Amino acid sequence: MAILAQTTSNMERRNFLKKGLAAGTASLFSRQLLARETDASLQAADNKPFRLNYAFHDGMFKNSAGEDFIEQIKFAHSMGFRSIEDNGMMGRPIEQQKKIGDTLAKLGMNMGVFVVTSDSWHWKTSLTSGKQEWLDRMIKDCKEAVEVAKRCNAKWITVVPGNFERTLSLDYQTANVIKALRMASAILEPHGLVMVLEALSDNPDLFLRHSDQTNMICKAVNSPSCKFLFDMYHMQRNEGDIINNLNKTWDEIGYLQIGDNPGRKEPTTGEMNYKNIFKHIYTKGYKGILGMEHGNAKPGKEGEIALINAYRESDSFII
């Protein structure tokens, strides 16, 4: 009886090991198959441009292409993206600015926005104050931005007027901002550059926060070099009603940016119906850039693949 029991026990262990090995093999095969299917799905979309012109930023595809921004640009182009944006372009070495511009030109890609600033004055109480020191800094930075734009083939540059000046009424602050932006436009307009004003939701100290406010300031500046950067993530947080507000401010919109809410990640990760928003933007005839100013919802290469697939899904609207 003892021998029989031992034999039975050995057989059970062998069966258990076989089942475990089979399950492990099946799991491994399943993961490999999924990886191949994912790679195949990306290759199927290989180099096929999106309907709209989405612009990624440095670091978004670093796990797939490496830390070098140039290599990320080449990878993104192979995935169908045709533009980049780079908030920190003004802080890059001159040779790197040129190299990025040359790479974009060779690939037939576009440069989106970079931020006009040398010392983060856009996060301070600056243009709203009306003080000459801030006007001088802005003028200096706008002149430098003209040279940077030449190197990287840029057309759009982001300007944020800064924080509230609590010692002045809103109307005085608005007048100060309009004056400053008219001065900036006079520098940029001869070069065909467009300053896009970004209304933000990051903190309550920021002066520029709403679409109607930004629209009014653009109308008052009255220059083709002063337009509205409609960041849909910020506008969703501050006011919602995205499609209606796009329509109301359409004549002054020079650039669009993307980010789902909550979380500020790629489309399909939050509450916003980007597939429908993109369809609306497309049917209105928008030919400009939509900046992907958001993070990746998931880490690593898998997260980057998920991001690409999210854009393919959101861009697959039916007309």
Predicted ranges, named:
Residues 87-105, 161-165:
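Glycine-rich, proline-tolerant flexible connector loops at the mouths of alpha/beta enzymes
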Residues 71-89:
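Catalytic domains of carbohydrate-active enzymes, especially glycoside hydrolases
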Residues 121-127, 165-169, 204, 237, ...:
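A short acidic, helix-capping loop that chelates divalent metal ions and anchors anionic groups
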Residues 2-63, 67-77, 153, 208-230, ...:
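Histidine-acidic metal/acid-base catalytic patches
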Residues 46-59, 117-127, 161-164:
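N-terminal small/glycine-rich loop or linker at the start of catalytic domains
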Residues 20-32, 46-48, 107, 127-227:
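Active-site acidic/histidine proton-transfer and metal-coordination neighborhood
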